[in-house]
Amino acid sequence: MYHIFQISGEVIKGLGLKTKILITIVFSTLLILSVMLLSFSNNFNNKLFAATINDESETPGRDRLIGGLLTADFDEGSCLSRYHKTFLYRKPSPYKPSEYLVSKLRSYEMLHKRCGPGTKAYKEATKHLSHDENYNASKSDGECRYVVWLADYGLGNRLLTLASVFLYALLTDRIILVDNRKDIGDLLCEPFPGTSWLLPLDFPLMKYADGYHKGYSRCYGTMLENHSINSTSFPPHLYMHNLHDSRDSDKMFFCQKDQSLIDKVPWLIFRANVYFVPSLWFNPTFQTELTKLFPQKETVFHHLGRYLFHPKNQVWDIVTKYYHDHLSKADERLGIQIRVFRDQGGYYQHVMDQVISCTQREKLLPELATQEESKVNISNIPKSKAVLVTSLSPEYSKKLENMFSERANMTGEIIKVYQPSGERYQQTDKKVHDQKALAEMYLLSLTDNIVASSRSTFGYVAYSLGGLKPWLLYLPNDNKAPDPPCVRSTSMEPCFLTPPTHGCEPDAWGTESGKVVPFVRYCEDIWGLKLFDEL
């Protein structure tokens, strides 16, 4: 349309002065009106959005602070998910945080504000890290002690270990600082008001980051084995190795005797890829405190995850848009999370068979009707069910979609199948991939029921955030669907996949770790430990 407004130089020259002035006034007026219209549109949209938020905030039964779990000291617009997650959930969580946990979190926030990055206390605490002298037992480093979390492995692992390390910080009055070299800062809002949990990039010990492993000279497990650490002389920092390949010596860090020594070290560096919370209950001192924090023992990650993890606005926009477009209008929502632990990922028929077998046996999805049965009108007003599938492979959702679109089912339900993405392979540390992964974890947590793959940290995060007790798909063996295909968990807690084999005290060394305390038992579907309320 630009050519309409083109006027040749000759025509311009031929116009009178008054005409030129008139044209200038007209165009100027149009320009001003356009700017005003755009401004009005933006203001209108902002007011409309604010009105929507206010309406949500006034919705009866919706507790924006989640029983005091969250503080009100944040600006809502800077992180929309923080206070508005509850408005998307199918119903308020029946699991309420204890008053003791709420009080502990408020105290922690004050401590983090005093000791966090940029404070005088932080600057003082980092002075001693430039040289590797040993500390004397009498030496004090002030009130601030720290635990640094290093980002490792996939997003599910990272969120589980972040919650684990934060709980350890709560129990030991340490400040948690988060490795800022990866994309955590691009995915999650700051959880503590008036400060930051992101480790400054100039932190002295980060120049050794690639060297933190079992062979590192300040690795606690290695120092134990070499008898090179004692209660009178200890280094200014220790590295805690809590990965899937941890040794027994590495796994002793949580024990009471070891903690009395570790407690004197001002800086701890944590590398972990497992949810080690269950082992903290083996320490009698920790156990007393944990019981007060979490009277309902299976709510640890449910509460800590909702306190710590608030997707940034860009991620939250993905969640809310997809939820409203595809899931919000359904009478019921079913989540199916599929992870194949093989070098060659992709679609496997025996996995598809297992998913169908589990969902139909457990009455989560209806069986298909025969030709005769399909002629029977089951219901005048059929119920609608949205099935949300998350997988690296899109074939699973396509097979389910075809299955229910081509034939009638026994209940007459309207089954709609959705899959937000199918990226074929995991792309950890790629910002867009991790944003999608986080969004899909939250979408799964918004479902009414969930079926999840055994051993999948992605699934652990989703159903624990949502307060859901999942149906866990057993690991297939020899390319065959297991029978039974799945088991209903009696706990919503994640599984600690590489736990210690025994408790802390010598009299417990002959006792299997799943029998040391009654509420820390073996996971239903795979070797590991998890927390249970039901005895």
Swiss-Prot record:
Residues 42-535 are lumenal. Residues 1-20 are cytoplasmic. It is a single-pass type II membrane protein. InterPro entries: XG_FTase. It is found in: Golgi apparatus, Golgi stack membrane. GO terms for molecular function: alpha-(1,2)-fucosyltransferase activity; fucosyltransferase activity; galactoside 2-alpha-L-fucosyltransferase activity. Expressed in roots, stems, leaves, flowers, siliques and seedlings. Keywords: Cell wall biogenesis/degradation, Glycoprotein, Glycosyltransferase, Golgi apparatus, Membrane, Signal-anchor, Transferase, Transmembrane, Transmembrane helix. The lineage of its organism: Eukaryota, Viridiplantae, Streptophyta, Embryophyta, Tracheophyta. GO terms for biological process: cell wall biogenesis; cell wall organization; protein glycosylation; response to salt stress. The chain crosses the membrane at residues 21-41. This is Probable fucosyltransferase 4. It comes from the Eukaryota. It comes from Arabidopsis thaliana. Pathway: Protein modification; protein glycosylation. May be involved in cell wall biosynthesis. May act as a fucosyltransferase. It holds the Pfam family XG_FTase. Belongs to the glycosyltransferase 37 family. Signal peptide: none annotated. Glycans are attached at N136, N226, N230, N377, N409. Its EC number is 2.4.1.-. GO terms for cellular component: Golgi cisterna membrane. PANTHER family: FUCOSYLTRANSFERASE 10-RELATED, FUCOSYLTRANSFERASE 2-RELATED.
